[in-house]
Curated annotation (Swiss-Prot):
NHase catalyzes the hydration of various nitrile compounds to the corresponding amides. Industrial production of acrylamide is now being developed using some of the enzymes of this class. InterPro entries: CN_Hdrase_a/SCN_Hdrase_g_sf, CN_Hdrtase_a/SCN_Hdrlase_g, CN_Hdrtase_asu/SCN_Hdrlase_gsu, Nitrile_hydratase_asu. It comes from the Bacteria. It is an enzyme of class 4 (lyase). This is Nitrile hydratase subunit alpha. The modification Cysteine sulfinic acid (-SO2H) is found at residue 108. Its EC number is 4.2.1.84. It comes from Pseudomonas chlororaphis. Inactivated by oxidation of Cys-110 to a sulfenic acid. The gene is nthA. GO terms for molecular function: nitrile hydratase activity; transition metal ion binding. The modification Cysteine sulfenic acid (-SOH) is found at residue 110. Keywords: Iron, Lyase, Metal-binding, Oxidation. Binds 1 Fe(3+) ion per subunit.
């Protein structure tokens, strides 16, 4: 007896698989109404490195806020409304003249979404995740950041308990700049710790 059932797998795109999974979960009422739309809004518009730039610039000009940020990063970011998934346990890492902090997620690609936005592609790559821990200075140099030989590089591995944000040193030449202008110096790479804020 012949059969018309094919034993050859039909390839599907990740988008098609995600849509099929979504439909199954929705049909079983396992996804709250509006959840996906809300998450899409957060990812597309609300989670952004500009949020982190506002936090850093505020810390540069406001000593009380800086102290709060270093004591309780979650509470400090919440003052701006930067909360939500991956932002429950925010820890600010303060750069000093002798210490440069860098963030990595050695197991996957977790970041502090509400303040850093979604991770860049290179951050998710195995090479970056594996090499940064072993040869941080070399990796930073390859990414365009040259540090003095006596600077200690501290690599912080993101976990379920901690989501990090680098608080860089305020750059020389920025003394005359307003808080809004200072925000423009802080990029996603600066917040991750692989770049330095620069004036001009």
């Amino acid at each position: 007896m012949s059969t018309s059932i094919s034993t050859t797998a039909t390839p599907s795109t990740p988008g098609e698989r995600a849509w099929a999974l979504f439909q199954v979960l929705k049909s079983k009422e396992l996804i709250p109404e509006g959840y996906v739309e809300q998450l899409t809004q957060l990812m597309a518009h609300d989670w952004s490195p500009e949020n982190g730039a506002r936090v850093v610039a505020k810390a540069w000009v406001d000593p009380q806020f800086r102290a709060l940020l270093l004591k309780d990063g979650t509470a400090a970011c919440a003052q701006f409304g930067y909360t939500g998934p991956q932002g429950e346990y925010i820890v600010a890492l303060e750069d000093t003249p002798g210490v440069k902090n860098v963030i990595v997620c050695s197991l996957c690609s977790c970041t502090n979404w509400p303040v850093l936005g979604l991770p860049p592609e290179w951050y998710k790559g195995f090479e970056f995740r594996a090499r940064l821990v072993r040869e941080g200075r070399t990796v930073l140099r390859e990414l365009g950041t040259e540090l003095p030989s006596d600077t200690v590089i501290k690599v912080w591995d993101t976990s379920a308990e901690s989501r990090y944000l680098v608080l860089p040193q305020r750059p020389e030449g920025s003394e005359h700049m307003s808080e809004e202008q200072l925000q423009q110096l802080v990029t996603k790479d600066v917040l991750i710790g692989v770049a330095l804020p620069r004036v001009g």
